[in-house]
């Protein structure tokens, strides 16, 4: 059991501060240029806000990217399908930066850096699940993850004659322009109210019996 789709890239370091991005999935946009001195999200930057955000997030973690790069991406994850194409770009960028600059980070760290970039740079209040699944995924296994503690274990999946089917609903899904942030805020409000009467750290700590009381 494994998704046979993904995001792929080739990159090269530059001797200056320029950042040049090209996606074969958005070839109509051509090459989008920026620089290490301009790590500010913008509508004009389009999809490159994701790799730029990761470069920014590494800097926030004390790992400065000291030279620019040329990055070409190609992916077959349907955009807006809920399969985390943006998170895959973030994790892939993290892999490339780790390789280029020798940053001492684990795959789990790359997931957290991707989440940081999405939360603080792209202003989407996502959780860790998408980036974690991409960075830590293992063939023929699901991941049982406690997102509050990041404790996890692999759960082998042997489907035999069964299949997991991903269907296209033709409904585009993007966290940035969806009700995600609103739903997240509602859950946080509910947690704060519940914490006034029960001792829980997350909504996941609330068992059914206590809830029914």
Where in this protein do the model-derived segments appear?
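C-terminal nucleotide
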Residues: 8-46, 59, 141-213
